[in-house]
Amino acid sequence: MAHKKGQGSSRNGRDSNPQYRGVKVYGGETVSAGSILVRQVGTVIHAGANVKLGRDFTLYSVVDGVVKYERLGRDRKKVSVYPAAAEQASA
């Protein structure tokens, strides 16, 4: 029998915290200014109208309004927030 415990149990037992990335608000939903729309690594989705890009590539709304996901060229996506008053007037 081994008189030492071995290295298996002492080297295990760690796990990193989850990052909670992804789309937080979907198209057609209403948001208030400062609401986080997408958490991402790099610009998977680009900032459109009334949307800013945070230091960690988080996209957030600058105005109150309705979220819309759109194409940006052939292979890119962008998210925009259009003010609710303008959205109701066009509907």
Curated annotation (Swiss-Prot):
Signal peptide boundaries: none
Annotated region (Disordered), positions in chain: 1-22
UniProt key word Ribonucleoprotein: yes
Pfam families, per the entry: Ribosomal_L27
Single GO cellular component term: cytosolic large ribosomal subunit
Keywords: Ribonucleoprotein, Ribosomal protein
Composition bias, Polar residues: 7-19
Any one GO biological process: translation
SUPFAM superfamilies (UniProt xref): Ribosomal L27 protein-like
Family, as annotated: Belongs to the bacterial ribosomal protein bL27 family.
Protein name: Large ribosomal subunit protein bL27
Gene label: rpmA
